[in-house]
């Protein structure tokens, strides 16, 4: 692939030449550079039939019954991967230089001829619908559009940095995907994407709003230690396997409204600084929120937990709304503290074992019309302000 690699390097350098040509107006320089960018990203979007065979061709031996010349296909795939990844690496090298030292020219990059123009940050990179079949870890991206892209084999963006608005909307991840430690400095959208394998977002940082609305996670989803500095939207997402949000930190509104959790959902020791919405969500396996902090309003109205629901030692610093919630098995609110008004009106507690509610309510607590199908023990609960059990029903021993 020497000729194609040389072409990629030449075109990348030509972009630099256009952007740094002082004889041309900035608009002209930017338009000419964008034209070359569009040509290179067009190559990335070109279909490649062997991409679908990536995992087979990256094996040591051909599987029984393989159609075609396995060795030749392996070589062809490796060459195509090298060429396409080189395009990303050339983009990344320049974008990293702009991001790390956008204003200064202290001679550190004197070996780069021509110099890197800060106008690289204004360019758009359209990879929409592209087949991606190679790792892109630890690269820099700017204004990247991966909408409707298909990732064949493991999608590796671990340690990557994304500047500018980024879209993975309706992207298809055919197997495992890793965004471990990735850094998104601006808006990012994964809405309607599908993760067929494990989705790894542990330690990822989202500096602006992030949308995972209507995403389907077929494999396990790991958002442990992820940081969302603005809004985090997971509304109507579907988690078909275990979901790990332990030690999650959200600074903006976090929405998990109408989400379906078919696997175990773990939010242990998480911090929600703003409102947290779990209204109408369904937990088909254990839901664990132990030791978490809800700094804003916590909305669990209409939530359904079909197995254990663990809220032990949770602190609700503002109002908590569990109206109409349904707890069908064991629920544990031991040591939970409600600093704001707590509403459990019309909630159903139908777990079988006797439950002791060792909860602290400094403000109003509303259990009006709640239904307790098991023996409920509030002897260890602390009610400092008004408490209401109007028309609440309790099981008899």
List each language-model region with its residue ranges.
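N-terminal leader/targeting and pre-domain segments
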Residues: 5-12, 17-397
């Amino acid at each position: 692939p020497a000729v194609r690699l040389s072409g990629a390097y030449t075109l990348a350098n030509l972009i630099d030449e256009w952007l740094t040509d002082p004889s041309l107006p900035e608009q002209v320089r930017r338009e000419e550079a964008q034209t070359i960018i569009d040509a290179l990203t067009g190559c990335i979007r070109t279909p490649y039939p062997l991409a679908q065979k990536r995992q087979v061709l990256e094996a040591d031996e051909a599987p029984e019954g393989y159609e075609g010349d396995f060795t030749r296909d392996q070589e062809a795939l490796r060459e195509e991967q090298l060429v396409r990844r080189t395009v990303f690496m050339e983009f990344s090298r320049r974008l990293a230089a702009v991001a790390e030292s956008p204003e200064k020219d202290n001679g550190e990059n004197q070996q780069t001829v021509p110099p890197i123009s800060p106008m690289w940050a204004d360019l758009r990179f359209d990879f929409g619908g592209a087949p991606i079949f190679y790792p892109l870890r630890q690269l820099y991206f700017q204004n990247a559009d991966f909408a409707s892209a298909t990732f064949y084999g493991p999608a590796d963006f671990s340690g990557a940095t994304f500047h500018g608005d980024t879209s993975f909307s309706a992207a298809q991840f055919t197997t495992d995907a890793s965004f471990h430690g990735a850094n998104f400095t601006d808006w990012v959208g994964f809405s309607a994407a599908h993760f067929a394998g494990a989705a790894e977002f542990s330690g990822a940082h989202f500096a602006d709003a992030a949308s995972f609305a209507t995403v389907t996670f077929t494999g396990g989803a790991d958002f442990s230690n992820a940081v969302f500095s603005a809004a985090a939207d997971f509304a109507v997402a579907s988690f078909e396997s275990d979901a790990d949000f332990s030690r999650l930190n959200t600074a903006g509104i976090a929405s998990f409204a109408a989400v379906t959790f078919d696997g175990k959902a773990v939010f242990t020791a998480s911090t929600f600084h703003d409102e947290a919405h779990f209204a109408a969500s369904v937990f088909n396996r254990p839901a664990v929120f132990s030791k978490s902090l809800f700094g804003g309003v916590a909305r669990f109205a209409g939530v359904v937990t079909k197995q254990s629901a663990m809220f032990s030692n949770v602190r609700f610093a503002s109002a908590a709304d569990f109206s109409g919630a349904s707890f069908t098995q064991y629920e544990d609110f031991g040591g939970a503290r409600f600093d704001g008004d707590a509403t459990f009106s019309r909630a159903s507690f139908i777990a079988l074992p006797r439950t002791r509610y060792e909860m602290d309510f400094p403000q109003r607590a509303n259990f009006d019309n709640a239904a307790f199908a098991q023996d409920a023990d509030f002897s260890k609960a602390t009610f400092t302000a008004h408490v209401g059990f109007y028309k609440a029903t309790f099981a008899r021993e």
